[in-house]
UniProtKB/Swiss-Prot annotation:
Its EC number is 6.3.5.7. It comes from Limosilactobacillus reuteri (strain DSM 20016). InterPro entries: Amidase, Amidase_CS, Amidase_dom, AS_sf, GatA. Heterotrimer of A, B and C subunits. Gene3D superfamilies: Amidase signature (AS) domain (3.90.1300.10). The gene is gatA. It is an enzyme of class 6 (ligase). GO terms for cellular component: glutamyl-tRNA(Gln) amidotransferase complex. This is Glutamyl-tRNA(Gln) amidotransferase subunit A.
Length: 490
């Protein structure tokens, strides 16, 4: 089975009405995954035996009308803890790590009787924009197997784009849900910071990380995001705000008439011409539906990437200190003393990009450089947040391209970290400000036929307006209905 021609609600109805059983659906899902996994390589591990066992249990007790995800196969990014199922963060350091507890988001999914088909590939410790930094293998873009799927949630995006699953969990620290969504022509939502618990997420940048979904369509995304949202006393940064029923507002009456859309002029700087054409057409379409489109300025956008990489790398250097070769994780062989354990375990266990960011972060936090780098970057973060606040005084959403280009060729940028980092120029400011943002399919490049994503940014905790805008665009276009001819190159 592939999930291109269905939705979560339709699938739920079929399961409730016994048009298909959870066991049949799960078997068909694995058949589909196995049919293209050799090409796409979206999964680090598959969970077939446990998934089929779980499906049989769900069939035995039955599925009620209020259990939306019961019996539904979904995927989980491999930096999200799953009890009894290896969680590697795509790193040699955690290659054999078997968690003893579930992340909060997984607990919620288990309570809703979902079926976990497997753990998806990512850049090691979620550090990267192409999924080429995985310690195990590179995931391929289903639209063109010679191109990257984006990162760090590239495996999750590729699994959804390939029709393996209706939805896959990802994490977004600086664009790691939205950029893969754009590259793969799917929907990817980063909720407001604090909307979803981070408990059980392998930490990269704790003040940036947020969990979200990659899905085939906007309404499924809204339904699944609501399921994992809400306060968690184990995560002191999780919000006490009530979680709205976003999907209930997505219907034939939803419109964008009078919606005030801000388009930052800085978001067109450096855009590839083919991307620019798609984004301008998308804005024209929204305007034709009654939205009011204004050009605005977010003047500190250009400082976002350097500030982000200082701050996020500083947090990463602190978070990754725990991997020392002593308590758990990879430990180097034939070590001579304690210092040897530390040095060799970390040198051999971490990949090049992770070590690069640890070094950058440690330098930024060191005596004599803290004020010049970390402190200054923190000030830039506040200025970026203020830019957004100023624009949102007179506008409902901010809209622009998700990325400056379409998916690039595998190997094209992996040896050029600075170019790779600049891919995040349009996404990292959102994480700096903790705002909700979603990438939706907006069209295809006239140059190479690859998908282009439209990024919709909302006010803090106003996911509803983001979903409304994306839903109206989606329902009045057909870009989300286009699917890759797997194996074909555009």
């Amino acid at each position: 089975m592939d999930f291109y021609q269905t939705s979560l609600s339709q699938l739920h109805d079929d399961l409730v009405n016994k048009k298909i059983s959870a066991t049949e659906l799960t078997k068909e899902t694995f058949d589909h995954i196995k049919g293209n996994e050799d090409q796409v390589k979206a999964f680090i591990s598959l969970n077939e035996d446990q998934a089929l066992k779980r499906a049989a249990e769900i069939d035995a007790k039955g599925i009620s009308a209020d259990q939306l995800t019961a019996g539904v196969p979904l995927a989980v990014k491999d930096n999200i803890l799953t009890k009894g199922l290896t969680t590697t963060a795509a790193s040699k350091m955690l290659e054999n790590f078997n968690p003893v507890y579930d992340a909060t988001v997984v607990e919620k999914l288990n309570a809703a009787d979902y079926i976990n088909v497997g753990k998806t590939n990512l850049d090691e410790f979620a550090m990267g924009s192409s999924t080429e930094n995985s310690a195990f293998f590179t995931t391929h873009n289903p639209w063109d197997l010679t191109r990257v799927p984006g990162g760090s949630s590239g495996g999750s995006a590729a699994a959804v784009a390939a029709g393996d699953v209706l939805g896959a969990l990802g994490t977004d620290t600086g664009g790691s849900i939205r950029m893969p969504a754009s590259f793969n022509g799917v929907v990817g939502m980063k909720p407001t910071y604090g909307r979803v618990s981070r408990w059980g997420i392998i930490a990269f940048g704790s003040s940036f990380d947020q969990v979200g979904w990659l899905t085939q369509n906007v309404k499924d995304n809204a339904l699944l995001t609501a399921l994992i949202s809400g306060n968690d006393e184990r995560d002191m940064t999780s919000s006490l705000k009530e979680v709205p029923d976003w999907a209930a507002q997505l219907n034939e009456n939803t419109n964008v008439k009078g919606l005030r859309i801000a388009v930052p002029k800085e978001y067109f700087d450096g855009l590839d011409e083919d991307v620019q054409e798609v984004i301008k057409a998308a804005l024209d379409h929204l305007e034709s539906l009654g939205a009011i489109v204004d050009e605005v300025s977010l003047p500190h956008t250009k400082y976002g990437v350097p500030a982000y990489y200082i701050l996020a790398s500083s947090e990463a250097s602190s978070n990754l200190q725990r991997y020392d070769g002593i308590r758990y994780g990879f430990r180097a062989a034939d070590v001579k003393n304690l210092e040897d354990v530390y040095v060799r375990s970390r040198s051999e266990g971490f990949g090049e990009e992770v070590k690069r960011r640890i070094m950058l972060g440690t330098f930024s936090l060191s005596a004599g450089f803290y004020d010049a780098y970390f402190n200054k970057a923190a000030k830039v973060r506040r200025l970026i947040a203020q830019d957004f606040e100023d624009v949102f005084k007179d506008h409902d959403v901010i809209v622009g391209a998700t990325g400056a280009s379409t998916a690039f060729k595998i190997g094209a940028e992996i040896d050029d970290p600075q170019t790779m980092y600049m891919n995040d120029v349009l996404t990292v400011p959102v994480n700096m400000a903790g705002l909700p943002a979603m990438s939706i399919p907006a069209g295809f490049s006239a140059k190479n036929g690859m998908p282009v994503g439209l990024q919709i940014i909302g006010k803090a905790f106003d996911e509803q307006t983001v979903y409304n805008t994306g839903y109206v665009f989606e329902q009045t276009t057909d870009f989300h209905k286009k699917t890759p001819k797997l194996g074909g190159q555009n």
